[in-house]
Amino acid sequence: MAKLLLVTGLALLLNAQLGSAYNLICYFTNWAQYRPGLGSFKPDDINPCLCTHLIYAFAGMQNNEITTIEWNDVTLYKAFNDLKNRNSKLKTLLAIGGWNFGTAPFTTMVSTSQNRQTFITSVIKFLRQYGFDGLDLDWEYPGSRGSPPQDKHLFTVLVKEMREAFEQEAIESNRPRLMVTAAVAGGISNIQAGYEIPELSKYLDFIHVMTYDLHGSWEGYTGENSPLYKYPTETGSNAYLNVDYVMNYWKNNGAPAEKLIVGFPEYGHTFILRNPSDNGIGAPTSGDGPAGPYTRQAGFWAYYEICTFLRSGATEVWDASQEVPYAYKANEWLGYDNIKSFSVKAQWLKQNNFGGAMIWAIDLDDFTGSFCDQGKFPLTSTLNKALGISTEGCTAPDVPSEPVTTPPGSGSGGGSSGGSSGGSGFCADKADGLYPVADDRNAFWQCINGITYQQHCQAGLVFDTSCNCCNWP
């Protein structure tokens, strides 16, 4: 018994020294910079103390070699990897692929040993050149969407060869080994067509399971984006469309629980109801809900856009069977996640001994704290606390952007922030939040810690005080 207590004590001590047993892996998207006004997000807006790993999405591929995609990726890479100067424990990875990237470049690249070698060599050079700690393979999906059946095995071959090359390079360079991870499917048919789970799991450091987009307007009826459990009336393959089933499918088919990372969406899916009075789960729909003013994509709202909808008079419902909320207003219906559902899922994750949480994406959280009245990064912070991620020795940013110098009534046009502190003093005695600008309906004041920032709505929109949001006039 004394031995057992000693071993337990050592384990607890070791865990205290190493930090949390769980990982919090946060994606950043390089197109978030193009969102208007308060939605614009760059690496400098990331709080480096929240996540254990940050993943930059996405890189591309040309002639079987990894490449940049955006005109300013190299500049953003530096800002992204400089976050490690403020958190010495932070690891950064670069993701390649994504849904819009398709499958063809991956299929060509894995098809021959020479092509794979070309790719792996380019990846090592690229990651070391720009200061990343690993590569995240986001092939959606091997063996599906035009990818031939043999790609299931060739994906395993690629990952095995990459892991071996990374190990060899670490020895030769006397540097820590580069990590190799993958974002993988949550749909059972895509999993079966795409992954040799036991073999693949040997070589991947983490397996990021995309346990979201499980329902959407493509089905013709309402459904939750990322339900923890099935809805009671779901049968057949529909009963597989939940986080619990998907994660256990990966585990039961040969992936170690500690390598499996549960996907958490910081966004929701919107629908148009055919009949506004039929507004529960499974209600008939006629298509995507309207695009949000910042993310500008039909059927999709960032968490901060969701808060605007909720504050505009939507009815919120907690779906106890699936442990997630939904909301509706007139003919608009929303399936989403909130602080409560993130907390419930985090406890479930720990009870099942999974390796941690992955979020898509940190730029979709209420990163300014202006929309939800829950502080900055409320969803990501919920997971950080629930998983016991240590922030010791980490320096968080003070404010998300520079204060504005324009005094009220000067009618400044253009961007969403700029200049230095001083100027208006509008926020000196105001609570944190958003306020209208007296003579400019397109503009609004953002108050943070008594400091004044002037922001602008997207062209054509006006600041609406009924929802504290940018809206159509």
Swiss-Prot record:
Span of domain GH18? 22-390
- Say which species the protein is native to: Mus musculus (Mouse)
Task: Quote the gene name from the UniProt entry.
Answer: Chia
Q: What does this protein do?
A: Degrades chitin and chitotriose. May participate in the defense against nematodes, fungi and other pathogens. Plays a role in T-helper cell type 2 (Th2) immune response. Contributes to the response to IL-13 and inflammation in response to IL-13. Stimulates chemokine production by pulmonary epithelial cells. Protects lung epithelial cells against apoptosis and promotes phosphorylation of AKT1. Its function in the inflammatory response and in protecting cells against apoptosis is inhibited by allosamidin, suggesting that the function of this protein depends on carbohydrate binding.
- The reaction(s) this protein catalyses: Random endo-hydrolysis of N-acetyl-beta-D-glucosaminide (1->4)-beta-linkages in chitin and chitodextrins
Question: Which PANTHER family does the annotation name?
Answer: ACIDIC MAMMALIAN CHITINASE, CHITINASE
* CDD domains tied to this protein: GH18_chitolectin_chitotriosidase
Task: Select a single GO molecular function from the record's annotations and give it.
Answer: endochitinase activity
**One Pfam family linked to the record:** Glyco_hydro_18
EC number(s) recorded for this UniProt protein: 3.2.1.14
Q: Which residues bind chitin?
A: 70-71, 97-100, 141, 210-213, 360
Residue positions of the active site: 140 (proton donor)
Record's subunit section:
Interacts with EGFR.
Q: What is this protein called?
A: Acidic mammalian chitinase
Where is it expressed, tissue-wise?
Detected in macrophages and lung epithelial cells. Detected in the acinar cells of parotid gland and von Ebner's gland but not in submandibular and sublingual glands. Detected in gastric chief cells. Also present in parotid glandular saliva and gastric juice (at protein level). Highly expressed in submandibular gland and stomach. Highly expressed in parotid gland but not in submandibular and sublingual glands. In tongue, expressed only in von Ebner's gland. Expressed at lower levels in lung.
Q: Which family does it belong to?
A: Belongs to the glycosyl hydrolase 18 family. Chitinase class II subfamily.
